[in-house]
Amino acid sequence: MSDKKWTAEQLAAITTRDTNLLVAAAAGAGKTAVLVERIIGLITDPHRPVDVDQLLIVTFTNAAAAEMRERIGQALSKALQENPHSKRLARQLTMLNRASITTLHSFCLDLLRRYFYQLDLDPGFRVADEVEAELLRLDVLEELFERRYNQDNVEVFARLVDSYGGQRDDSRLQDLVLELYRFSGSHPLPVQWLTSLAENYVIPEGKTLDDQTWIVQIKKTIFQEVEGVLGLLKQAQWLAKQPGGPEPYSKTLTEDIINIKPLTNNDWDASWEKLYRSITAIKWSKLSPCRGEIDDQLKNKAQNLRNKAKEKFNDIINTYFSAEPTVILEDLRSLQPLIADLAKLTIEFMELYQKKKQAKGLVDFGDLEHYCLTILLDKENDAAEFRPSAVAIELQQQYAEVLVDEYQDINAVQETILRLVSKKNNRFMVGDVKQSIYRFRLAEPKLFLSKSELYANTDNCQGTRIGLSKNFRSRLEVVNAVNFIFRQIMTKKAGEITYDELEELHCGADYPQAEDVKTATGPVEVYLIDRKDAQLEEQNTDSAEEKLTDGEEQEDLDSDQAEARLIGRRIQAMVKGTDKAMGPEFKVWDKEIGKYRPVSYRDIVILLRATTGRANTFLEELRTMGVPTYAEVGTGYFEAVEVETFLSLLKIIDNPRQDVPLAGVLRSPVVGLKASDLAEIRLCSKEGDFYDAVRIAAAADLGDVAVTLTKFLRQLENWRSRARRDTLADLIWLLYRETGYYDYVGGMVGGTQRQANLRVLYHRAKQFEATSFRGLFRFLRFVERLKDSGSDLGAARSLSENEDVVRIMSIHKSKGLEFPVLFVAGLGKRFNMMDLNKDMLMHKELGLGPQIIHLGSRVSYPSLPKLLIKQQIRKESVAEEMRVLYVALTRAREKLILVGAVRDLEKSLEKWCTSTYQAGWTLPDAELMAAKCYLDWLCPAIARHHNGHELRSLAKTEGQPFSEVATDPSAWQLVFQALKDIKNQTQENKEQSQGLLVKIKDMEPFEDAGLIKEVERRLSWQYPRAEVTTRPAKAAVTEVKHKFDELARQEAGVMSYRPKISGRPRFLQQDKGLTPAERGSAIHLVMQHIPLDKLPDEEGVQVLLQNLIQKEILLPQQAAAINPNHITGFFASSIGQRVLQAPKVERELPFSLALPATEVYQELPECGDEMVLVQGVIDCLVDEGDGFLLIDYKSDAVYPGQDSPVDRYRGQINLYARAVQDILGKPVKDRVIYLFNNGQIVHI
């Protein structure tokens, strides 16, 4: 076991054997380190050692799998270094490359390659690119619908199309089929699940609603909602009885409570008919008038609460009891044939799609898991019990343990696969259900929760639950803040899990105390922006809450701008300081250098719930303020003017009779006409399409315009001809060259980004043609499909994430990462519940919930199953949003800052402080589940803290919060900001800048406030070490090695003389073959790619050369220059044998090494701490456990009288060795130059 100090819980997770283990690892708990240590422990167990290829290690991304393999390799290398004579450890390192450390998709693909013959699959099958799969699905849908329309009996299908197809065509029904197909794929037996969907709507004559299995859940929902109404009435009654309260209201409120209370008795046996009669019979009396001295505030609050209760009760009636039970029953019966036909249509699509893929030798990502299940399930399997096949039993015997990372994100299909390849007690599952945020990918956190509850029972023998609650990431201030919030809001009912002692974080991070350094300690900052002056009217309907309007989009834009400006100012104050205190506000801990350093832009990250449509606003505002910012924006690509213009050009090459694209191209720099020219062209032919007008105008007497059009039409005809002959990628590159558009956009503002966007289009076209689809028309159709579905390619990257910039990313992208300073913005933005408005809802357990549509009257209303499913989806979505918030807050290492905007702070405060004085830690479940945004959780929780007194004061509430909550050790700093103040401040800055520019332009004097001297000081500043500025700050090893060589010769008393011999010009040489440098590069490429699993022979080298030519890694003339005997000679040598036997070999390994400037440039005077970055690439580095063997390849010819290779390359090799020792921390025990021309081994 490693020397690392493990906690007792970590040690248990590492060492516990012979049982299924579920490790609930909280954020920052070091789960990956524990997982790696467990694997090493299994391999090195002195009693029952396991080979690394006897482990199945499943991760959820390729990057995670690669990191896991690397970390296991490092741990094995370290173990081998401590025990260099262990043949077993050396063998484990050798086997590591073939070990099953993989994503589940890759595991399934490997199984398909081995057992394809069981599936009627072409052995040469390939996995379809998502683009190809999407296009194929569209083709299949069109063919399927065409078949359905041509069938004799289409009555049910026609009704299905009319009901759910959309207003103009059947596109919405096609989308519904695709959605249902994808959704069913998360079920282990999708066809059986689809077939069962209509069962909920089979209601025989004589049966009632009470005979339906789902009616009890509907009643439960109604009872809960009625309890919420009762709670509001009780709050109003309590206010009425307070001193100064509206006492006359008490009698009416008591009557209300007496009338409503019987409906909350959870009478499950009560018939729907009885429930209908009871609820619709409720009447509301008028409140008695209040006389005398009454507190108006208490009176208004009591009135508002009762009005809210009445509204909620009326909503219950309108939602569930708008029709007689007999009417509802008949409507449900009418849905059965529609649901059955929809399921049948989806199954037909599935089968036809499968046939098309098999015909093309394709599988898609959805197939991988289901094909794998087919292999692993016994052929006589039934749905009630998943029995393993012979292949599954064989795999069970092969794998000593199955280890699963991120288990909280598993789905039912994946769980079934893992169960089938596992023994009874050899599963190790690690994850954190509080971080399960992939519901949109159909992840099922309930699988984790059910195991957690089962294994937590000590009497259970199926497995053991171990909790890792120590957080080694965040400062105590962050840990306390997270615990304070989630103790109150994450309940079993609202968040699907109780945030108790088992789940809360315990601080384990060690941030050294620094008395002379200001660190990032201090309260969590919360900025609340009041949008009241935006003058946007509040919309109170449910539909307005769940559906964005244009007004809300404008509101979001204003909120984003305001938040960005506020954040920008806070960042500038952090990094640059303020007028009162210049310089960075605090220092952050840097693990790499082991000390505190000033906070910089790269330490800061801004998290948004989603970056789509929002990150660009933040980017624009922050960059305007001078804050360097980076965001990997997933949208905006198709809106980029250069992409739009070029797609228009491709469209008219495909079909020039498209008016809008044609006009766009003519107006663009590709042709360069003015708007007036376009008007003149249209006047030449007022009828017909614009292309005809262009042709007529080209032949008319229009001067330069006619000349330009003639040239363009000639080019267009040539391009259309090339489009029929050339590949799509070649056509696009030809257009870039011939139009000069690629170079043109490079000269525009943001030219680098624009050119990158055009390159993405070229590469996307290349990827498209690698599929089974071809042609410009299909490519354009695919692009339009992407646009219509709201998908995007994402703007190309033109800036590295590692630069000193503030990064903006989505919360989902941040998962698994950590940041010194974290802003979580957009906390007032509404949760996206738009999916709840669809005509058809689907749920994995409850089935389908359709809208009932009467085609004759076009009247529609939600069916009871839809209402149930809607409620369940909303509940699950709210729980997921709570987990998303948990992920966001736990990314912070040292400083956490929360920012949100609200429409009306006064109204929001009234809502937030409703339960401030409730006893106990948790807030009411009804209030938590009714949240519309993250602030609806954060602010009610903070209002109960002693730092939340401002929230309580502004809400005008009295009393003391629950003492245990109020005295919590977390610390909060609340800052209130009006939107108008942020806008005014920004406007003032603009006006000041504009006024200053006007005065400068008019050469008028202005008050400098000491600025002139400061400007003069900055402009006259000179670098103190002018000599250093004449030398490069970055150099390659080959550039500086001569300086070390010369120094070494001087120390040895050797002087070299190398006469300069000018080579003949290339055109005078008889042999125009490769230069020595080019031949050397070719040898390096071969040595980089040659397999090391066996001794290469001449035939093997020839095969490798052909493969490298096919992959365009090597040119044919380079391959011709390679002598296979030189390659085989290397591996036959003693050095080559050491390479083949080594457990780990790195080839073409790049490095960067910072050296003192005086060490590189000895002629310079003392340069203080000036450094030079030296970069190089090591040809071959062999890890032999106790040290490295460093090999440098040379293809130089050695002639008599020349310096020996030792003299020529000593400096270079010594630099390489120094870099290895400094960076990897292990000595280089042997330094070798291998000369390929004569097979000589030269030791340095």
From Swiss-Prot:
Presence of the UniProt keyword DNA repair in the record: yes
Cysteines joined through disulfide linkages: none
Keyword ATP-binding in record: yes
Pfam families noted in UniProt: PDDEXK_1 (PF12705), UvrD-helicase (PF00580), UvrD_C (PF13361)
Biological process terms in GO annotation: double-strand break repair via homologous recombination
GO molecular function, one term: 3'-5' DNA helicase activity
Cofactor(s) required for function per UniProt: Mg(2+)
Domain UvrD-like helicase ATP-binding stretches: 4-475
Classification via PROSITE patterns: UVRD_HELICASE_ATP_BIND (PS51198), UVRD_HELICASE_CTER (PS51217)
Reaction catalysed by this enzyme: Couples ATP hydrolysis with the unwinding of duplex DNA by translocating in the 3'-5' direction; ATP + H2O = ADP + phosphate + H(+)
Sites where the protein binds ATP: A25, A26, A27, G28, A29, G30, K31, T32
EC assignment: 3.1.-.-, 5.6.2.4
The UvrD-like helicase C-terminal domain, residue ranges: 515-816
Assigned GO CC terms: cytosol; DNA helicase complex
UniProt region (Disordered), positions on chain: 538-559
Alphabetical UniProt keywords: ATP-binding, DNA damage, DNA repair, DNA-binding, Exonuclease, Helicase, Hydrolase, Isomerase, Nuclease, Nucleotide-binding
Quaternary organization: Heterodimer of AddA and AddB/RexB.
Reported function: The heterodimer acts as both an ATP-dependent DNA helicase and an ATP-dependent, dual-direction single-stranded exonuclease. Recognizes the chi site generating a DNA molecule suitable for the initiation of homologous recombination. The AddA nuclease domain is required for chi fragment generation; this subunit has the helicase and 3' -> 5' nuclease activities.
PANTHER family, A to Z: ATP-DEPENDENT HELICASE_NUCLEASE SUBUNIT A, UVRD / RECB / PCRA DNA HELICASE FAMILY MEMBER
The family this protein is said to belong to: Belongs to the helicase family. AddA subfamily.
UniProt name for this protein: ATP-dependent helicase/nuclease subunit A
